[in-house]
From Swiss-Prot:
Name of this chain's protein: Fibrinogen silencer-binding protein
Listed GO CC annotations: nucleoplasm; nucleus
Tissues expressed in: Expressed in multiple tissues including brain.
Key words of the record: Isopeptide bond, Nucleus, Repressor, Transcription, Transcription regulation, Ubl conjugation
Leader sequence residues: none
Gene Ontology molecular function: identical protein binding
Assembly and interaction partners: Interacts with APBA1 (via PDZ 1 and 2 domains).
Coiled coil ranges: none
Further comment: Intragenic, in the second intron of RAB54B gene.
Sequence position, cross-link Glycyl lysine isopeptide (Lys-Gly) (interchain with G-Cter in SUMO2): K94
Physiological role: Transcriptional repressor that down-regulates the expression of the fibrinogen gamma chain. Represses transcription of GSK3B gene promoter via its interaction with APBA1.
Domain of life: Eukaryota
Location of the protein in the cell: Nucleus
Length: 299
C-alpha cells in the first residue's frame, strides 16, 4: 500500500521537488472549471506527479496524489500571504521571499496581480471606513445641535400664528350656520364639520354641485335626508329601484352559490357510487375467476 498517511512534514527540498514536478502541468492544474474532462485530466496529472515524486528518493516517505495536491494548495496560499506581508512592510521582495514562493511566482505570475488587487480593495475599504466614521461623527455633531434649532422654530411658529378663537359671537355663528346649510344643500362631502376652515375647503375643492349617493345614507334623520334631496320624487324612485336591483342581484348570487354547492355534493356522491360499483365488479370478476380454475372445480 502506497502512503496511507504522511509520516513527517515536508522539507524544503521536498517542496521544491514538488514544484519542479508540477511546473510542466501547471497550465492544466490552474484551469478553474467544472468540466468533467478537465477534472479527469487533473487527476491523471496528479497521479503522474505522485509516481514521479515517489521515484525521486528511497529515503523519503511515500506520498499520495491527494497529499501532494494539498501541499501544492498550501504553498500557493502561503505565497499569497507572504507577498501581502512584504507589500505591507514595504521590504525588498528578492531578499526576504522564500524559495518556494519564488518558484510559485515563476510558475503562476497571476499571484502577484492578485495581491495587488487585494491590496487595492483593502485600501478602498479602509477609506470607506474612514469616510463612514467621519460621516457618523459629523452626523452626531449635527444631532447634538439640532434639537435647539427645532425648539426655536416651534416657538417662532407659536409666536407668529395665534391659536384660533374658540368663542364666536352670535352674528358670526348665524352667518356660519346659513353658509353651512346653503353648502350642504348643493355639495355633500365626507366631512360635515361646522368649522369655518372645513367649509372654505369644501367651497374651493368641490368642482360640481351634484350630491353624492353614498353620503345620502349617512344621516339618521328623515327630515334632514328629505331636505337634502329637495323633495324630488324622481331621485327617491331611482334610489328605490337601484336598491331593489341590488337586493335581487344578491339573492340570485346566493342561489347560484347554493346550486353550485349542491352540484358539487351530487358529483361527489356519484363518484362514490361509481367507485363502489367498480369495487363490486372487481369482486365478481375475482369470484368468477376462482370458479373457472380447475383446482376449485375439483374441490
Amino acid at each position: 500500500m502506497v502512503g496511507k498517511a504522511r509520516s513527517s512534514n515536508f522539507t524544503l527540498s521536498e517542496k521544491l521537488d514538488l514544484l519542479k514536478l508540477v511546473k510542466p502541468y501547471v497550465k492544466i492544474l490552474e484551469e478553474h472549471t467544472n468540466k468533467h474532462s478537465v477534472i479527469v485530466e487533473k487527476n491523471r496529472c496528479w497521479d503522474i506527479i505522485a509516481v514521479n515524486y515517489n521515484a525521486i528518493g528511497v529515503d523519503r516517505p511515500p506520498r499520495t496524489a491527494q497529499g501532494l495536491r494539498t501541499l501544492y494548495k498550501r504553498l500557493k496560499e502561503y505565497a499569497k500571504q507572504e507577498l501581502l506581508q512584504q507589500k505591507e512592510t514595504q521590504s525588498d521582495f528578492k531578499s526576504n521571499i522564500s524559495e518556494p514562493t519564488k518558484k510559485v511566482m515563476e510558475m503562476i505570475p497571476q499571484i502577484s496581480s492578485f495581491c495587488l488587487v487585494r491590496d487595492r480593495n483593502h485600501i478602498q475599504s479602509a477609506n470607506l471606513d474612514e469616510e463612514a466614521q467621519a460621516g457618523t461623527s459629523s452626523l452626531q455633531v449635527m444631532l447634538d445641535h439640532h434639537p435647539v434649532a427645532i425648539t426655536v422654530e416651534v416657538k417662532q411658529e407659536e409666536d407668529i400664528k395665534p391659536p384660533p378663537p374658540l368663542v364666536l359671537n352670535s352674528q358670526q355663528s348665524d352667518t356660519l350656520e346659513q353658509r353651512e346649510e346653503h353648502e350642504l344643500v348643493h355639495v355633500m362631502e365626507r366631512s360635515l364639520s361646522p368649522s369655518l376652515s372645513s367649509v372654505d375647503m369644501r367651497m374651493t375643492s368641490s368642482p360640481s354641485s351634484i350630491p353624492r349617493r353614498d353620503d345620502f345614507f349617512r344621516h339618521e334623520s328623515g327630515e334632514h335626508f328629505r331636505s337634502l334631496l329637495g323633495y324630488d320624487p324622481q331621485i327617491l324612485q331611482m334610489l328605490k329601484e337601484e336598491h331593489q336591483i341590488i337586493l335581487e342581484n344578491q339573492k340570485n348570487f346566493g342561489l347560484y352559490v347554493q346550486e353550485k354547492r349542491d352540484g358539487l355534493k351530487r358529483r361527489q356522491q356519484l363518484e362514490e357510487e361509481l367507485l363502489r360499483a367498480k369495487i363490486e365488479v372487481e369482486k365478481l370478476k375475482a369470484i368468477r375467476l376462482r370458479h373457472d380454475l380447475p383446482e376449485y372445480n375439483s374441490l
